[in-house]
């Protein structure tokens, strides 16, 4: 009877009817095979025997049906394999055909310049490979997907249209597709022919000799190539977009395939397990059925009758013990209970396994999604993140410092190169300037020589001309010599007055320092009357000198002629001595200048080396510099006075000697300057060579700066010398003109001497000159006083600057002290922080070690818990088995203890009949018989319950919750 629950194969059609034999048996009801039932004592026994025979016949029919089902299943599997191969081949053909059409379309878009992409797409079929349609409502997920996709437009593929169409429609559609492919190929051929013709035409135009045709061909070719380039660009963009979408779809499909493959493998394993279980149960059922059939045949063939404790069969020798039969029934019930318990346990284990698998999947999903969050929430990750942020900020700072250092390096290199280039340019320009100046000096020397020759010729001519005016000139020279003597006397007096004035000024300064402003006013009031007698004394002396000069001129008129020659000789000798003295003075001045340059260089070097010294040394140096400047100022004043005296002597000398002396002096001066410049040029070239060798050193740079300053100083000095030379030349010209004027004036005077007294005129002129000299001395005195005041103001300003610098130095020293204190505090704090960091690192290491130990203990505890749970489950299993054994043994004990209470065979059969009826009734409504089976799980219910569940969209099995669709249930017929 257990064979009623056998399941149908999945590939069997749902609406199939039972065989004709079965239907005929049900319809007729009388064409039943005759069976011997043996001796029957009551109607109940008759019902029991009829039911037993029906059961045996049903078992035979079920065996036959099962064999038929196996054959049909094999046939269906063959057909499915064949259909799968046919579908695969169709899919391959469709895919390659669609790829062929796609390639043709791309080639047409590539080469067809007249046809657009839209025209091509209208002719083309949708050649997408269809996805295999899922079984309708196979499970809840597919049902939900189908319900979700009901609103979307269906994407009809070529194979889907073929599958849904008849044979004639299929042939027409295939013909249309072949025709479209043929048209596309013919279009490619025509496009290729057009391109070939166009290329041949362009080649003919290019090969033709006409320039206009060649230019037109080139322009046409350029436009064609540009258009082709645009089309290629569009095509590449389209293909790239398509490749991107296809790659995305491929990745999605690949993930789906992987999930489907994993699911298929799981389902296959489940199917194998279930198939093995089904085969096992079927074999057991067949064995029991055969055994039961044999027993029934024996009983029916020989007949039997039960008597109390034992029974004997009429017409045979076999006896059956009723007690043994009851024991067998009890064992059967126990076995059923055990089987039911085992099934319940297996169901529980299966549910537990499903729950564990679902939980495992959920945990996997959560692990995939929540691993990052968990890792981010860990303290180690946060610590690493903080360390990373700190290191990243430090790396950014170091990168910024590196960039700044690189920029500074590049800037310093650029500035260094720029400075070197500027120095080289300056050197080249200075060399050029020196060369040009040397050339100019040589030119001027040549010009001076020429002028000297011209002047010498003129001098000879003037000598020849002046021999006639000799006596007049001698008289004039005698007068000029007397006037010069008188001027010397006046100058001596002036010098004496100046000395007195300096002494008075020094006394005045002392008294000013002692007494103050009141005494200054008294001194200024006392100086005014002193100046007046100083002015009156020369007037009286001038008058006395005039009177004495007039007397001497009258008395010595005869002696003048005899002494003129001697005076001329003495003058020439004096002039030579003066020229020698001038040359010596010039040489001394040059030596002084060189010494000054050396001293200035030494002072610069010492200033550079002692920049970090104290301010007291600076004050001393400033005082020494001021003293040197005062000494130089005195020397300059003395040289100025000497130059004035020389000018007076030049003016007093005759024109011929003066011109000669001037020319000789100019020639010597120019020669000396030329030699000096050449010597300087050689020195500069030597220095340049040395400095070029030592260009990289800082000493070389310092020397270059010193040489540049020296060059600037020499240039300034040379410019000053040129200016002085030009001024002297201008003064010489002025004095020459004045001398000529004096000659004319002397001629007039000689004419007037006859009419007037020459002595008065000379005395008056000398008095005017002395007054002018006195005025000049006053002006010089005022200028010196102004210079002294300016020097004082400069000294005061420098003292204020020194004070400010000292204050700044004190402030900087205090700032340095505070900075050092702060630095010490910060270093202490840094050391404390380092110690704290070390302690924190040690604590972290200790905590890590403790954490590892705790994790190890936790793992050990978990392993122990798992082992304990496993042992507990084993103990529970053993306990259940022991309880079952105890219950079984108790039942045996009860049966052995109470043999009288054993029920009769009729009651047992009635109970079995009730059990079978209960099994044949639907478990959902408990009213109707089972006449429908679910092909997904092979559970049997009544057709009305299944239909109502399908109509109310509760499409799940009431027992196992397996989803089913419209094609997943059908009727069955149980006789």
Swiss-Prot record:
It catalyses: S-ubiquitinyl-[E2 ubiquitin-conjugating enzyme]-L-cysteine + [acceptor protein]-L-lysine = [E2 ubiquitin-conjugating enzyme]-L-cysteine + N(6)-ubiquitinyl-[acceptor protein]-L-lysine. PROSITE patterns: ZF_RING_1, ZF_RING_2. Residues 43-90, 168-375, 429-898 form a coiled coil. Residues 1-30, 125-155, 507-622 are annotated as: Disordered. Keywords: Acetylation, Chromatin regulator, Coiled coil, Host-virus interaction, Metal-binding, Nucleus, Phosphoprotein, Transferase, Ubl conjugation pathway, Zinc, Zinc-finger. A zinc finger (RING-type) spans 922-961. One of its GO terms (biological process) is negative regulation of cell migration. GO terms for cellular component: HULC complex; nucleolus; nucleoplasm; nucleus; ubiquitin ligase complex. Its EC number is 2.3.2.27. Its main location: nucleus. The modification N6-acetyllysine is found at residues 21, 348, 510. SMART domains: RING. The keyword Coiled coil applies. Expressed in the normal brain and also in malignant gliomas (at protein level). The keyword Zinc applies. InterPro entries: E3_ubiquit_lig_Bre1, Znf_C3HC4_RING-type, Znf_RING, Znf_RING/FYVE/PHD, Znf_RING_CS. The modification Phosphoserine is found at residues 41, 136, 138, 522, 562. GO terms for molecular function: chromatin binding; histone binding; histone H2B C-terminal K residue ubiquitin ligase activity; identical protein binding; mRNA 3'-UTR binding; p53 binding; transcription coactivator activity; ubiquitin protein ligase activity. Residues 543-552 have a biased composition (Low complexity). Component of the RNF20/40 complex (also known as BRE1 complex) probably composed of 2 copies of RNF20/BRE1A and 2 copies of RNF40/BRE1B. Interacts with UBE2E1/UBCH6. Interacts with p53/TP53 and WAC. Interacts with PAF1; the interaction mediates the association of the PAF1 and RNF20/40 complexes which is a prerequsite for recruitment of UBE2A/B. Interacts with isoform 1 and isoform 2 of PA2G4. Interacts with FBXL19. (Microbial infection) Interacts with human herpesvirus 8 (KSHV) protein RTA/ORF50; this interaction targets the SMC5-SMC6 complex for proteasomal degradation. Belongs to the BRE1 family. This is E3 ubiquitin-protein ligase BRE1A. The gene is RNF20.
């Amino acid at each position: 009877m257990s064979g009623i629950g056998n399941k149908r194969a999945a590939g069997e059609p749902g609406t199939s009817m039972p065989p004709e034999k079965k239907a005929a048996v049900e319809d007729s009801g009388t064409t039943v095979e005759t069976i011997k039932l043996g001796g029957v004592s009551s109607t109940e026994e008759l019902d029991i025997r009829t039911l037993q025979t029906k059961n045996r016949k049903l078992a035979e029919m079920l065996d036959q049906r099962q064999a038929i089902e196996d054959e049909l299943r094999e046939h269906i599997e063959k057909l499915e394999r064949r259909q799968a191969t046919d579908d695969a081949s169709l899919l391959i053909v469709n895919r390659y055909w669609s790829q062929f059409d796609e390639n043709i379309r791309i080639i047409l878009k590539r080469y067809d310049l007249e046809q657009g992409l839209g025209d091509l797409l209208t002719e083309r079929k949708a050649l997408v490979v269809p996805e295999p349609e899922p079984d309708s409502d196979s499970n809840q997920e597919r049902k939900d997907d189908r319900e979700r996709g009901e609103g979307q437009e269906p994407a009809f593929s070529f194979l889907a249209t073929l599958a849904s169409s008849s044979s004639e429609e299929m042939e027409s559609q295939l013909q249309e597709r072949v025709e479209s492919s043929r048209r596309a190929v013919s279009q490619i051929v025509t496009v290729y022919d057009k391109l070939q013709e166009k290329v041949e035409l362009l080649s003919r135009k290019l090969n033709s000799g006409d320039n206009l045709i060649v230019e037109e061909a080139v322009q046409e070719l350029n436009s064609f190539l540009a258009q082709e380039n645009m089309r290629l660009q569009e095509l590449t963009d389209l293909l790239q977009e398509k490749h991107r979408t296809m790659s995305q779809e491929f990745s999605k499909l690949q993930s789906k395939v992987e999930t489907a493959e994993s699911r298929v493998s799981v389902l296959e394993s489940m199917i194998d397990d279930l198939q093995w279980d089904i085969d096992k149960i079927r074999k057991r059922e067949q064995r029991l059925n055969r055994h039961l059939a044999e027993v029934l045949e024996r009983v029916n063939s020989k007949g039997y009758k039960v008597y109390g404790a034992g029974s004997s069969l009429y017409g045979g020798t076999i006896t059956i013990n009723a007690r043994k039969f009851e024991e067998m029934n009890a064992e059967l019930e126990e076995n059923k209970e055990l089987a039911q318990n085992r099934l319940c346990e297996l169901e529980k284990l299966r549910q537990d396994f499903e729950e564990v698998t679902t939980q495992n999947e959920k945990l996997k999903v959560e692990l995939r999604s929540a691993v990052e969050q968990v890792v981010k929430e860990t303290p180690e990750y946060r610590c690493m993140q903080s360390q990373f942020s700190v290191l990243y900020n430090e790396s950014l700072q170091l990168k910024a410092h590196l960039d700044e250092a690189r920029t500074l390096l590049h800037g310093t290199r650029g500035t260094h190169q720029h400075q070197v280039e500027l120095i080289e340019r300056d050197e080249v320009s200075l060399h050029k300037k020196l060369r040009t100046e040397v050339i100019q000096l040589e030119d001027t020397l040549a010009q001076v020589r020429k002028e000297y020759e011209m002047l010498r010729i003129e001098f000879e001519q003037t000598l020849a001309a002046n021999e006639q005016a000799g006596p007049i000139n001698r008289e004039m020279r005698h007068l000029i010599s007397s006037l010069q003597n008188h001027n010397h006397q006046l100058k001596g007096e002036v010098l004496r007055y100046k000395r007195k004035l300096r002494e008075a000024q020094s006394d005045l300064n002392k008294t000013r320092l002692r007494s103050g402003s009141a005494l200054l006013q008294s001194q200024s009031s006392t100086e005014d009357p002193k100046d007046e007698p100083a002015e009156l004394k020369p007037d009286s002396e001038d008058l006395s000198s005039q009177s004495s000069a007039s007397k001497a001129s009258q008395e010595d008129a005869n002696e003048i002629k005899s002494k003129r020659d001697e005076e001329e000789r003495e003058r020439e000798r004096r002039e030579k001595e003066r020229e020698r003295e001038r040359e010596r003075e010039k040489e001394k001045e040059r030596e002084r200048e060189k010494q000054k340059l050396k001293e200035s260089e030494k002072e610069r070097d010492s200033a550079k080396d002692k920049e970090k010294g104290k301010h007291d040394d600076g004050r001393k140096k400033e005082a020494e510099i001021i003293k040197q400047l005062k000494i130089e100022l005195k020397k300059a004043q003395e040289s100025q006075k000497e130059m004035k005296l020389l000018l007076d002597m030049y003016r007093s000398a005759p024109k011929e000697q003066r011109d000669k002396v001037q020319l000789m002096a100019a020639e010597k001066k120019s020669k000396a300057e030329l030699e000096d410049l050449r010597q300087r040029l050689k020195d500069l070239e030597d220095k340049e060579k040395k400095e070029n060798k030592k260009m990289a050193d800082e000493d070389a740079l310092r020397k270059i700066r010193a040489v540049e300053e020296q060059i600037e100083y020499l240039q300034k000095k040379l410019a000053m010398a040129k200016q002085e030379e030009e001024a002297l030349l201008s003064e010489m010209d002025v004095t020459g003109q004045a001398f000529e004027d004096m000659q004319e004036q002397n001629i007039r005077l000689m004419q007037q001497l006859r009419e007037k007294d020459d002595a008065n005129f000379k005395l008056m002129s000398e008095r005017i000159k002395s007054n002018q000299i006195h005025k000049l001395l006053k002006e010089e005195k005022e200028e010196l006083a102004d210079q002294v005041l300016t020097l004082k103001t400069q000294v005061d300003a420098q003292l204020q600057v020194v004070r400010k610098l000292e204050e700044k130095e004190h402030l900087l020293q205090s700032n340095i002290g505070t900075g050092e204190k702060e630095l010490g505090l910060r270093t202490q704090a840094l050391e404390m922080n380092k110690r704290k960091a070390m302690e924190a690192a040690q604590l972290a290491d200790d905590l890590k070690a403790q954490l590892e130990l705790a994790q190890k203990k936790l793992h050990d505890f978990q392993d122990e818990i798992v082992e304990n749970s496993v042992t507990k489950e084993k103990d529970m299993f053993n306990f259940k088995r022991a309880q079952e054994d105890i219950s079984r043994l108790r039942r045996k004990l009860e049966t052995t203890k109470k043999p009288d209470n054993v029920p009769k065979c009729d009651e047992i059969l009635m109970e079995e009949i009730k059990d079978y009826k209960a099994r044949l009734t639907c478990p959902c409504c408990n009213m109707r018989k089972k006449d429908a089976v679910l092909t997904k799980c092979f559970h049997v219910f009544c057709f009305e319950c299944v239909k109502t569940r399908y109509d109310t969209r509760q499409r799940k099995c009431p027992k196992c919750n397996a989803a089913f669709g419209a094609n997943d249930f059908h009727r069955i017929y149980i006789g």
